[in-house]
C-alpha cells in the first residue's frame, strides 16, 4: 500500500478490479482513474504522511487516499498487503476516482455493511461462500467502498478519519458516519455491483469538492511549509502531486457532480434491496449456523448420552474389573470382554464425538471463515464496524457455545473417563486401553475444544488452553470452527463450557494419565518403569494435574499442531505409538506427569512447550530406542504415521483413517517401541529419579517434553487410532496384556540394555558429540532424522537427562491417582530399580553433560531431538525463557523453531545470557537444570541442548529443518535470531559439517563463480564509475545536479548494488569457506566447548548488547530482523545462520539486517563482532543499518548499500581481499573495541575467538562485504554507525545529503576501516566521501559563500584527515571522527544553505553520484580548487593567502601535527583560520555561517543525518570545528597570547581529549593522535556521537515500561490497537524526555510513523512469536530515532546558530561543551572504556540537549556561558560579539535555528514556548534572553555542570570557577541543584582555572573574542568546563534543547560521564534538570531570575567573573563584557 494501493478491502477485492472496470464504464473509469491517478495521489499522500505528522498533513494525505496511501503505518495496518496497491489507482481517473469514492462510501455504508451482515447478491456476505464469492462476486461496488476509501483522500472527512483512525473499522465508522449519512441516505448508488452510476447527491459532491479544495489548500500550505522548511524535494513533489491529484479530483468531482445532477438516484433502492438481501442472507446464515450449533449440541448430548452409556458400561466393567485390578496392575491379562466393552464404549463415544464434532468443525470452519471473511469484508469495506462486531460477537458467542458444548462433552467424557479411571485403576490393564482410546478421542475432541478455548481466550486466561491453542493452531482452528458452530452460545455459556472443558480436560488428562498408565502397564515395561517414576512424579503431577492436565490434553493438540507444524514430530510419534496405545498411554501418562511436573516446575507454557518439545524428544527417544531395537521399522511407521498424522491431523477423519492403517502397521512397532520406551523410560526414569525436585523440574521438564512428545504423539495416535480403536484396541490390548507381562520382564531387561545403550551412547556422544549431533540432526529428518534424533536422545537422556526426563514424565503421569498408587505398589520395586537406574543415568548424564562441557553435546542432542521432533523444540527453549515464550514457539512453529534456537529470540542477548548462564550452570553440573527450571527448566536443557540439537538438527536436516531455517532465514527476523545463537554455529560446526562439506564444495564453486562475477562487475563498475565520474565530475562536477541525471546515479547505484551483492555473496562464500574449514576443524576439535564459550561469552556478552536486541526484538533481534533490517532477513539468517553461513549472512544481511542478523548472529557466530555491535552499538548500528531512521526501510538497502559500499571499497580499495584483510584488522580493532566495550569485548572476544576460529577474518567480517560492517564489529557503536553510514553512503539515499554525508562518513569509515588494511584505499574512500561532500561543495560553491566552500573544504579536510588518520590506522575513531566531521560539515553546508533546499538536494544528489573514489577525488579536487579560491579570496581580503594552507594543511598538518598540534593546526584549524580570516572579513555573518558550518543544519540535516552516526557527527564536528575555530580565532585574533593559551590549552586538552577519546572511545582515535590529525581531535573530540549509553539507558527506560506491557499481552495477537498502544506508549515515554517543539513534534511524528511502519509488520502475529522482535524493533527504532533526534536537535540548534550568532555561539559553546564533555568524558571514558563513546553520545545529547538548553538559557543570559558558547562558534565573532557580549543576547528563538525554521521550536517547545511567549521570535530580546537565560541558565548551569563534570575530569580547572561566575550570573534558584554541583566540581577545578579564566576574562572582556577564545580554548580543552559549561548551556541549547536535562543530569553527575550519559539516556529531562528549569521556575520566575541575572550580568565585574567561567560561552555573543548589561537589557 505504500504505493498508494487500495485500502484493505480493496486488496481483498483485487480480483474484482477487472469486474469493476468491466461492470460499468463508470466503474471501469473509476477503477482506472482510481488506480492511475489515485496512485499518485496516494504516493503523494503517503509521502506527505511520512513527511507530515500533523493532522492537517494527515488530512491532506487522507484527502489523497487515506487507505490508498498506506504509506502511513496506520493505513498499512488497514490495508492487506496482498492487495495490489496501485491497481485501482492506475485504472481510474481522478473524477472517476471521486465518483468511486462516493460510490464506495455509499456502498461501504449501505451495501457493504449490509453485505457483511447479509448475503451479498454477489455472495459476498454469505459466510459459507464468503471466501469464494469475495473474489468471484466482488463487484465494483466492493471495490468502490475500498476505492472510495482510497479516494477518501479526496474526501476530507472520510480520509481524515481513516488515516487518523488506525483501523479500517474506525475509518469505516467515520466514513460511515460522515459518508453513509450523505451517501447512503442521499447518494446510495444502485450499483451495488458497481454497475450502476453513482447516485451521489450534488450536496455530497459539493461537500467533497469543498473537502478536496480544503485539502488542496492544506496540501499547498504543507508544500509551502516544506519548501520553506527545505524539505526534501521528493516530499514537495509528492505534495505537488497530491495537490494536482486533489485538483484533478476536484475537477472530476465537478464533472461527477454534473453527471450526478443529470442522473437519477434510481440505483439507490437497488443497493438498499441488495443490502437488505445480504443482511437477510446473513441472518439466514446465522440461523443456519445456530441450527447447526443446535444440531451439534444435540450431537453433543447424544455423545454425552453415549458417554454416560460408556460410563455405565465402564461401571459394569469396573465391577468386573475391580477384582482384576491386581491382575491388571500386575500385568495379568484382564478379561478381554472388559477391554472390548471399554474399547467399544470409548470408541463409540469417540466415534460419535468425531461424527458430531468433526462434521461440525468443517461446517463451523466454513461458517466461521465465511463469517470472518464477511466480517473482514464488511469491516474493511464497510465503514461501520458495529455490524461486524455483532458478527464477530456472534461468532465469538458461537465459538463460546461450541466450546462450552465441547466442554460439556468433555465433562461427560471426563466423567466417563473418571469412571473408567476408577475402573481402570481397578482394571488398569483392561480399562485403561479402552479409556485411553476414549481419552485419546476425547483428547482429540478436547484438544480441539481446549485449543478453541485457548483461542477464545475465554479459557479464563488459562495459559494451558491458550497455550494449547497457540501450540495447536490447526487443532484450535478446527475446534474454533466447531466452537463457531456452537459459537452462537452465549459467551457466559462459552466461558462456562470452557471452564468445564478445562476441568474436563484436566480430568481427561488425569484419565489419560491413568489410561496411559494402564496402557503403559499393558506395555508392561513402560508401565512398570513409568509407574515407578509416575508414582514419584505423580506426586508432582497430582499437584499440577489440574492445571497441567489441561495442558497435557492440549498437548496432544499441541502435539497435533506441532505435528502439523512440525510434520516430523508428534504426529509421527503418534503414528509410531498409535499401534502401541499403551505406549501412547505411557506417553500420555508421561504427558500428564510431564505436565504435572511442569506445572510444578514450569509454567503451563513451558510445560506445554517442553511437553511438545520433549514429547517429540520422548517420542524421538522412544523411537530412538525403537530404532535401536527396530529402528528401521519404527522409523518407517513413525514416518508414515507422523506424516499422515501431520497431514491428516487437521482433518481428523483422514488422520484417523490413515492412523488406523498406520496403527495397524505401527502396532508391532509400538510393541517394539513399548519395549524400547519401557527400556528408555526405565533408563530415563532411573536417570531422572535421582535429580532433586528442582532437578526433577528440569529433568521432568525435559523428560516430560520428551515423554510428552511420545505421549502427545501417542495421544495423537490415540486420536488417530480411535477409528481403529475397537479392532486395534482389542487386539492391541490383548497384545498389551501379553506384552505387559512380557514387557514387564523385557522392560527390566531393556532398561538394563537401554542403560547400557545409553551409557554407550553417552560414551559415543562424549567421544563423538558432533557425530551425535549430526546423527540427531540427520534423524531430525521428517521421520528417520527424527528417529536418529531419538537415537541420540537416549544418549541425550543420559547427557541431557532429556530421555530420563521423558521417563520421569511417564512415571509422573502414571502416578496419577489410584492407578499411580496401584502402579506404585506394583512397581515400588521397579521404582527402586528405576530410581537407582535414574541415579545412575543421572550420574552418567551429569558426567556426560559435564564432559560435554555445559552439556553442550547433550543440548545439541536434545536440540536435535526437539528439532528432529520439530523445530518446535525451540518452544521449550522459549518456554524456558517464558512460558509465554513457549507459546511464541507454539503459535508459530517455524519462527519458534528458529526462535527456539535462539531461545525464542525474546532477547537473544537476554535469552542467551540465560542460556549462557544455563550453559555455565550446565557446565557446572547437570543439576543446573533445576536452576533453569524456574525460568527455563527445560530451557536450560531444552534451550541449550535443544538449540544445539536444533542447530544440529537443522543443519542435519538441511533438507528438513535446516532448510526450513533457510526459509526462516527469509523470515530471518524471528528465526535467524534464534538460529544465530552460538548453537547454530556449534551445530554448524558439528552437524552442518557433513552438509557443509557438500555445501562447501558448492559454495566454493559458487564462490569462485561469484568471485569471478564480482571481479567482472567490479571491473565493469570501475569502468562505469570512471565514465560516470568523468561525466559527473569532469568540470568540478560541472554537470548540474540535473545533468548528473539520476539515471547515472541509478546506474552507479545498481552497479554498486550488483557489486555489493556479488561481493556480499563472494564474501559469504568465502566466509562459508572459512567457516566450513573452521567447522571442519572445530568439529573435531571442541565444537561444543567453543560453542559453550561462545555461549557464555555471547550469552553474557550479548546480554548487554542484546539489551536492545531484545528490545529491538524485531528491531534488531532476529526480529531485529523484523525491525527495519532484522526481521526482514529471517530467511537470510537461518539459511546462512550456521556459523559459516551465519558469518556470511552476518556480514551481509546482518548489514542489511545489521542489527537483527548481527544481533542474532553475534550470538550465534560472530557475537564477538556483532554482539559488541549488538549491544547498544548494535541498535546504534541498527540505527546505522537503519541509517537514517527515515531510511528504516532503506536500512536494509543501506546495509546492502553498505555491502555495496564495501564491494566498492573492496573493488576500489583492494576488492575482496580487503574484506579479509579488513576482517583481520577488524578483529584486532574489534578486540580493541571490545576492550573499550568492557564486558562485551570479553564475551565478544570469546565469541570472536570462537568465531574467528570458525570465521577467523569473518569475525571481524561480520559484514564481510562491508568492511564498515566489520568496522561495526570493531566499534560497536561508532563502527556500527559508521558501517551503517558507509552502507548508507553506498546506498542511494533518499536524502542525497544523507547519502553524501553518509558517503563521506561511510567512506571515511570504510577508509578508516580500510586504512589499517589499505591506507591508500582508505584515501580513495575518503576521497570518495570527501568527494561526495565536495561534489556538493562545487555545486554549492556557486550557491555557497566562502563559508560553504570552506565548509566543504573542511569536509574535504576532514575527509582527508580521516583518510590520513584512517591511513595512520586510527581507523574508526578517525573514521568516525571524520565521518562526524564530514557530517557536521555537510550539516553546516545544509544549515548554511537551508534557504536553498533545492540546491542542497541537487548538490547531494550530485554527491550521491560520486559513488566511486575517482569521482569523489575529482570532486574533492574541484572543491579544493573552489575552496582554495574562496579561501585565497577570503585570505586576500584578510590580507592573508591561506589558500595553500586550506588545500594543503588539511592533508599535511593533520598527518604532521601531533594530536595536540593537530588539534591546534588541524586542517580544519588552518581551514578555520582561513575561515576565520574569511569570517573576519565576513565578520559575524561569516562567523555565523562558519559556526553553522561547524554546527549542523537542522532542517535538511535531520534527513541527511538520518544515520545516528551522521547526526552525531555533526555535534562532534561542531565541537571539533568550534575548537578549531577557537584555535583559529585565538591564532588569528589580536590576542596571540590568549590564542596561544587557548590553542595550547586546547591543544593540550584536545590532545588529551583526543587521546582520551581515543583511549576511551577506541584505539582508532588514539591512532588519530598517532597520525596526528586535527580531524582526529576534531572528531576524536568525541564526535558528538549520540551517547549510545545514554540512549541505551533512555531506551531501556522506555523498554522497561513497554516490556511489561507486552508481557501482559503476550498471549494476544499483535492487533493494530495493541501495536498502536505500544507505539503510543513508546512515543509517550519518549516524549516525556523531550520538550515539545516543532522539531520534537516532527521527530515524534516521524518516530511514530516509523514505529508504526516497523510495528505494522508484526500485525496479526502472536505477540509471543514476535514480541522479542517487536521489542528489538522498537528499541532499534527508538535508538535510531532518538539518536537521530538528538543529532537533529544538535543540527537544529546548530542550523539556527548558523542563522543566528547566538546559535553559532551556542554551537561553539556546544562544541566546547562537547569538548569539555569530551575531555571530561574522555577522562571519564579513560576510566570507563565506553566513556569515550559515551562522550560522543553524551556530547550529542549534551550538545543536542545541553546546547539547546544553553542556547535557550545562556544565550539569553548575559552570562559568560553565552560568551563561552560564543567563543566556541563565535570566537571569531567573539572579537565582534565579545565586544558586545550582552548586546547579542539572543532569545531562544534567535539562538536556536529550530526557532527560525520551526524545527527547533518543536524541539524546545517548552523552552521556546516560554521564550516565544516572552518574545516568541525576538532575536536579541534581552528580557527574553535573560528570562530564557534564567530558565536556561539553570539548564546551562546544569549543562555547564555536565561539561564541568566532564571537564573537571579532563580539566580540573574551571568547574569551580564557572559555577562561581555562573552563580553570579545565574539566579541563586537556578544555581542550587546543578550549580552547586557545578560549584562543587568547578570549585575543585575552578580555583585553578578561575584564575586563568579570570585572567582570560579580564583580557576577554576588553576583547571578549580573543580572551573568550583563549579562555574558551583554555577552558574548552582543559577548562572546557568553563567554556563548555558556559558554552555548554548554549551548546546544549543549540545541541539538545529537548534533552537538556540529560545533559544537565550529566552535569549533575560530576566527573561521571558514564553516569551523566546514563542519566542523559535514561532521562532526557531529568527531574533535577527539568525542575530546575521547568518545575522550579515558572516563566515569570525565570524571567525574574533572568532579569536578576541580567542585572547581575549588567555588572561588568560579574560578567567578568561569570565570563571567567562563562566568558567563553557568551564571548561570541558578548563582544564586550559591558554588553553583558546590554544582554540583560
Curated annotation (Swiss-Prot):
<feature type="modified residue" description="Phosphoserine">
    <location>
        <position position="864"/>
    </location>
</feature>
<dbReference type="InterPro" id="IPR024138">
    <property type="entry name" value="Pericentriolar_Pcm1"/>
</dbReference>
<keyword id="KW-0206">Cytoskeleton</keyword>
<feature type="compositionally biased region" description="Basic and acidic residues">
    <location>
        <begin position="1756"/>
        <end position="1768"/>
    </location>
</feature>
<feature type="modified residue" description="Phosphoserine">
    <location>
        <position position="119"/>
    </location>
</feature>
<feature type="modified residue" description="Phosphoserine">
    <location>
        <position position="1228"/>
    </location>
</feature>
<feature type="region of interest" description="Disordered">
    <location>
        <begin position="354"/>
        <end position="390"/>
    </location>
</feature>
<feature type="compositionally biased region" description="Acidic residues">
    <location>
        <begin position="623"/>
        <end position="633"/>
    </location>
</feature>
<feature type="compositionally biased region" description="Polar residues">
    <location>
        <begin position="369"/>
        <end position="385"/>
    </location>
</feature>
<feature type="modified residue" description="Phosphoserine">
    <location>
        <position position="870"/>
    </location>
</feature>
<feature type="compositionally biased region" description="Polar residues">
    <location>
        <begin position="1268"/>
        <end position="1285"/>
    </location>
</feature>
<feature type="modified residue" description="Phosphoserine">
    <location>
        <position position="1777"/>
    </location>
</feature>
<comment type="function">
    <text>Required for centrosome assembly and function. Essential for the correct localization of several centrosomal proteins including CEP250, CETN3, PCNT and NEK2. Required to anchor microtubules to the centrosome. Also involved in cilium biogenesis by recruiting the BBSome, a ciliary protein complex involved in cilium biogenesis, to the centriolar satellites. Recruits the tubulin polyglutamylase complex (TPGC) to centriolar satellites.</text>
</comment>
<dbReference type="GO" id="GO:0097150">
    <property type="term" value="P:neuronal stem cell population maintenance"/>
</dbReference>
<feature type="region of interest" description="Disordered">
    <location>
        <begin position="1230"/>
        <end position="1310"/>
    </location>
</feature>
<feature type="compositionally biased region" description="Acidic residues">
    <location>
        <begin position="531"/>
        <end position="540"/>
    </location>
</feature>
<feature type="modified residue" description="Phosphoserine">
    <location>
        <position position="110"/>
    </location>
</feature>
<feature type="compositionally biased region" description="Polar residues">
    <location>
        <begin position="116"/>
        <end position="132"/>
    </location>
</feature>
<dbReference type="GO" id="GO:0035735">
    <property type="term" value="P:intraciliary transport involved in cilium assembly"/>
</dbReference>
<feature type="modified residue" description="Phosphoserine">
    <location>
        <position position="1317"/>
    </location>
</feature>
<dbReference type="GO" id="GO:0005813">
    <property type="term" value="C:centrosome"/>
</dbReference>
<feature type="compositionally biased region" description="Polar residues">
    <location>
        <begin position="1879"/>
        <end position="1901"/>
    </location>
</feature>
<feature type="region of interest" description="Disordered">
    <location>
        <begin position="620"/>
        <end position="654"/>
    </location>
</feature>
<dbReference type="GO" id="GO:0031965">
    <property type="term" value="C:nuclear membrane"/>
</dbReference>
<feature type="compositionally biased region" description="Polar residues">
    <location>
        <begin position="1925"/>
        <end position="1934"/>
    </location>
</feature>
<dbReference type="GO" id="GO:0001764">
    <property type="term" value="P:neuron migration"/>
</dbReference>
<feature type="modified residue" description="Phosphoserine">
    <location>
        <position position="867"/>
    </location>
</feature>
<feature type="modified residue" description="Phosphoserine; by PLK4">
    <location>
        <position position="372"/>
    </location>
</feature>
<dbReference type="GO" id="GO:0031122">
    <property type="term" value="P:cytoplasmic microtubule organization"/>
</dbReference>
<feature type="compositionally biased region" description="Basic and acidic residues">
    <location>
        <begin position="1189"/>
        <end position="1198"/>
    </location>
</feature>
<dbReference type="GO" id="GO:0060090">
    <property type="term" value="F:molecular adaptor activity"/>
</dbReference>
<feature type="region of interest" description="Disordered">
    <location>
        <begin position="1319"/>
        <end position="1338"/>
    </location>
</feature>
<dbReference type="GO" id="GO:0140706">
    <property type="term" value="P:protein-containing complex localization to centriolar satellite"/>
</dbReference>
<dbReference type="GO" id="GO:0022027">
    <property type="term" value="P:interkinetic nuclear migration"/>
</dbReference>
<feature type="region of interest" description="Disordered">
    <location>
        <begin position="866"/>
        <end position="885"/>
    </location>
</feature>
<feature type="modified residue" description="Phosphoserine">
    <location>
        <position position="65"/>
    </location>
</feature>
<feature type="compositionally biased region" description="Polar residues">
    <location>
        <begin position="1818"/>
        <end position="1828"/>
    </location>
</feature>
<dbReference type="GO" id="GO:0005814">
    <property type="term" value="C:centriole"/>
</dbReference>
<feature type="region of interest" description="Disordered">
    <location>
        <begin position="1720"/>
        <end position="1943"/>
    </location>
</feature>
<feature type="modified residue" description="Phosphoserine">
    <location>
        <position position="370"/>
    </location>
</feature>
<dbReference type="GO" id="GO:0005654">
    <property type="term" value="C:nucleoplasm"/>
</dbReference>
<dbReference type="GO" id="GO:0060271">
    <property type="term" value="P:cilium assembly"/>
</dbReference>
